[in-house]
Design a protein with these regions (language model features):
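Carbohydrate-active catalytic/glycan-binding domains of CAZyme proteins
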Residues: 20-349
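Sec-dependent signal peptide recognition
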Residues: 2-8
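Amphipathic, heptad-repeat alpha-helical segments
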Residues: 339-380, 395-396
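Charged, amphipathic alpha-helical scaffolding segments
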Residues: 379-387
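Hydrophobic h-region of N-terminal signal peptides that target proteins for export
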Residues: 10-18
Length: 396
């Protein structure tokens, strides 16, 4: 396929997205919360402006990690809407940080038609690619932060992620410094498997947390990533461990890097960048996790090149996000999520409510109601049914 055809295909995809954006109502943020097993689970939050978010389900997980991950914990969820407008995809790191930062060998693929009930597949790289040189369990130590993008040339989704291997490490004093490169694969139509990894981007030092978006105005793909090299400080500001930008005419590269950090200057490291378009606007938000400081930082751009600081959004209360991603959802999808959340919160409240004065008959009635409510929560995404059941639980 010629490049002009690819450009036309990419433009068509942007036109489709523009058409769908007429139904966009708000922003859904999918994230994990902290470095504990409870925190390393998928959580949701909603926003009307893309900057200020309110947690769903009282800040509790939406998807339980022990039901989807080989490590029983996840990190770095990336969520997006499929090209058909009705299917949703989520990919994430299969990792438990308490086992160490060099302990993860895989990622998770998830697919849903309602944002609540997901089919899932865990991909363990040493098992899936046993004959691939350098990807054995004794050498591979990181498969981090997967994300998705549609490849018009291939006609399928490309998944890309950071790989860390022991044979790439280099000595620094009496220690060895990790080295990461970005790789990519293609996902099958069932969203249950990936092709053999291929090199996407080698920065020349460690690079993680890739995020690619197509810029139709300039006919190029823009890759945002974290410079994970050893930090140095110049006049109080870090010259490493910030968000950088690279561009390419083809999705799989080669990418040319601009050697400057995009985030607001500071002495603290950042990671987990994610770019999304503002609803009803041609402007974009670049957000990233200021993980050492306890807030997310948001910057705005009209050209995906020059960014202006907007605000720091504190992580507090039930909203305590770490590396995640944002997508647009419709009013109906929001209603569904809020109805599901209302029932989940009501169930939790009733389970926790002391019942020392209840009769045996009342206790049996509560047990049956909770069983029915949990079954409804697990089986349906119908907002009316969810709200009706929530009202029954709240009224008990």
């Amino acid at each position: 396929m010629k490049r002009t055809t690819l450009a036309a295909a990419a433009a068509a995809l942007m036109a489709t997205a523009a058409g769908q954006h007429q139904q966009d109502s708000c922003y859904l943020f999918a994230f994990f919360s902290n470095n504990t097993p409870d925190g390393e689970q998928v959580r949701y939050a909603l926003s009307d402006d893309g900057l200020n978010y309110t947690s769903l389900n009282g800040g509790r997980p939406v998807v339980a990690s022990d039901t989807i991950a080989l490590k029983k914990s996840i990190r770095d969820p990336y969520i997006c809407r499929g090209r058909d407008g009705r299917t949703f995809y989520m990919v994430m790191t299969d990792m438990r940080s308490s086992e160490g930062w060099q302990s993860n060998d895989g990622l998770i693929l998830m697919k849903s038609d309602d944002l609540l009930h997901w089919q899932h597949t865990a991909i363990d790289f040493p098992t899936r690619f046993p004959s691939l040189e350098g990807f054995g369990r004794d050498n591979l130590h990181a498969v981090w932060a997967p994300q998705l993008i549609w490849d018009a040339r291939e006609g399928r989704y490309m998944i890309y992620y950071s790989i860390g291997r022991h044979d790439w490490e280099y000595p620094v004093g009496d220690k060895r410094q990790p080295y990461f490169k970005l790789f990519y694969s293609y996902v099958n139509d069932d969203f249950t498997d990936i092709t053999e990894p291929r090199l996407l981007f080698d920065f020349g030092t460690a690079a993680i947390d890739g995020d690619i978006i197509y810029d139709g105005r300039n006919g190029e793909y823009v890759l945002f990533f974290k410079d994970e090299g050893l930090p140095t400080v110049n006049n109080g500001f870090r010259t490493r461990q910030g968000v950088m930008r690279a561009t390419a005419k083809e999705l799989t590269g080669p990418y040319a890097t601009e050697f400057r950090h995009l985030q607001k200057p500071g002495q603290y490291p950042v990671e987990g960048s994610s770019v999304f378009r503002l609803i009803g606007s041609d402007d974009y938000i670049l957000m990233y996790d200021c993980y050492a400081q306890g807030y997310y930082q948001f910057c705005r751009s009209s050209d995906l090149k020059n960014f202006t600081f907007v605000q720091n959004t504190p992580t507090r209360g039930t909203f305590t996000p770490r590396h995640g991603s944002v997508m647009h959802i419709s009013a109906a999808e929001r209603d569904r999520l809020e109805a599901w959340s209302a029932l989940a919160v009501a169930i939790d409240a009733l389970e926790r409510r002391p019942a020392p004065t209840l009769t045996l008959r009342q206790l049996d009635g509560r047990r049956k109601l909770l069983d029915e409510a949990r079954a409804t929560l697990a089986a349906t995404a119908d907002a009316k049914r969810l709200r009706k059941m929530a009202a029954r639980v709240e009224g008990f």
